[in-house]
């Protein structure tokens, strides 16, 4: 069975973000760079960092397999230079194996892990507006995805477990492996985490979403962060969307900070969040409104840039939904893109972001405790944990599974 079919059969999807099926990225021509994304730019999450430090052999072997299968000219593991243990472990593994894979050490800025930002950093090329990395000859997989690729190919293992970080307002932050489908509330109770009358974020403080304790862990869950209600990391997420849209119409002072610091604007894309905010009283046909489709939803605008604490991110998400209903798709007349000159000095240092969001008191290592010690009495498996059509179950009600 070829690599693509193995990954499809074993259910390997992007372990972070939208869960793009990994097999669908594997073209056998036109790939110059195969990039492993180890930046893990969301504060308080340690999954990728811990996997690289503890399992460098799996990461390196999986990347080598995918490089060989696709015929990629170059394979790169991109991670922040400050991840000293991960850098040391990967360097040692590459020295031992002699594989033609390079490490690319990135600065400590947000969002270093955005795949289009990473492609520019590694290759010097800008992914076109509305495009994906393959448009400039690059493929990007995150570190846990590579861990699962190794399991699928070398161990015949399907993706039935997920690494997650438990952090925020907890006594002992931890990174661990749990069965997919584990109920969040059961897991937090098992770990002795107090989450009553608090907010649970699925993901990081920037791009994560508020979830209910009855929700299950999925293949794309990167972490569970616990915060007190009203904390700066969750206040905008808790706000009603109608209130956010109203404030966008009446409270935006057009300072343009959201635009000047927007990662996609700095890539050279035609995205100006400040003009979208200014256009909120107009129709969907307004040309600035359509720019919302270029937003990567990193949250830098709402968490760091806006002095009014408005949320261009959530405004853009709401606009995207309306444009999708209208069947609108973004098209660009430009063929070549270059990053804006100001990009080099407008990168936002992650430490400043942590201070702005009042995360410093929670910024403690969440070391990996390996082992299959989390054994829930039952799991709830959503059929749609990825981009594309829902999965089709191979078992029926009443079947015994192991």
Q: Where in the sequence are the language-model features?
A:
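Flexible, glycine/charged-enriched surface loops at secondary-structure junctions
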Residues: 72-77, 100-101, 195-203, 262, ...
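Conserved phosphate/anionic-ligand binding catalytic regions in large, soluble enzymes, centered on
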Residues: 11-27, 303
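Histidine-anchored nucleotide/phosphate-binding helix
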Residues: 53-70
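Flanking helices and flexible, charged tails adjoining ferredoxin-like Fe-S electron-transfer domains
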Residues: 16, 44, 293, 297-298, ...
């Amino acid at each position: 069975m070829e690599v693509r079919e193995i990954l499809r059969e074993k259910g390997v999807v992007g372990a972070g973000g939208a869960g793009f099926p990994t097999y669908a990225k594997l073209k056998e021509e036109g790939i110059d760079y195969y990039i492993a994304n180890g930046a893990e730019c969301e504060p308080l999450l340690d999954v990728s960092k811990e996997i690289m430090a503890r399992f460098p052999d799996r990461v390196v072997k999986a990347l080598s397999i995918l490089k060989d299968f696709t015929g990629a000219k170059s394979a790169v593991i991109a991670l922040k230079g400050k991840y000293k243990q991960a850098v040391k472990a990967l360097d040692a593994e590459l020295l031992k194996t002699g594989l033609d894979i390079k490490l690319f050490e990135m600065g400590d800025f947000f969002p270093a892990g955005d795949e289009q930002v990473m492609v520019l950093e590694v290759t010097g090329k800008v992914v076109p507006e509305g495009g994906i990395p393959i448009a400039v000859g690059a493929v990007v997989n995150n570190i846990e995805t590579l861990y699962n690729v190794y399991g699928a190919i070398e161990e015949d293992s399907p993706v039935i477990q997920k690494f997650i970080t438990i952090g925020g307002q907890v006594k002992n932050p931890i990174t661990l492996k749990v069965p997919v489908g584990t109920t969040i509330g059961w897991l937090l109770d098992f770990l002795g985490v107090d989450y009553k009358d608090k907010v649970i974020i699925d993901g990081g403080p920037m791009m994560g979403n508020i979830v209910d304790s009855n929700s299950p862990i999925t293949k794309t869950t990167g972490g569970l962060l616990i915060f007190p209600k009203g904390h700066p990391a969750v206040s905008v997420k808790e706000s009603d969307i109608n209130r956010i849209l109203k404030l966008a119409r009446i409270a935006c002072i057009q300072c343009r900070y959201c635009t000047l610091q927007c990662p996609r604007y700095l890539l050279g894309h035609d995205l100006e969040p400040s003009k979208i905010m200014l256009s909120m009283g107009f129709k969907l046909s307004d040309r600035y409104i359509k720019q919302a489709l270029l937003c990567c939803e990193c949250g830098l605008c709402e968490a760091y840039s806006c002095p009014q604490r408005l949320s261009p991110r959530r405004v853009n998400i709401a606009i995207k939904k309306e444009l999708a209903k209208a069947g609108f798709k973004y098209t660009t007349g430009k063929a070549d893109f270059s990053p804006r000159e100001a990009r080099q000095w407008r990168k936002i240092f992650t430490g400043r972001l942590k201070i702005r969001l009042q995360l410093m008191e929670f910024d403690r290592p969440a070391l990996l405790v390996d082992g299959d010690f989390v054994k829930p009495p039952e799991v709830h498996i959503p059929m749609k944990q990825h981009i594309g059509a829902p999965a089709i179950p191979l078992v029926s009600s009443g079947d015994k599974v192991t």
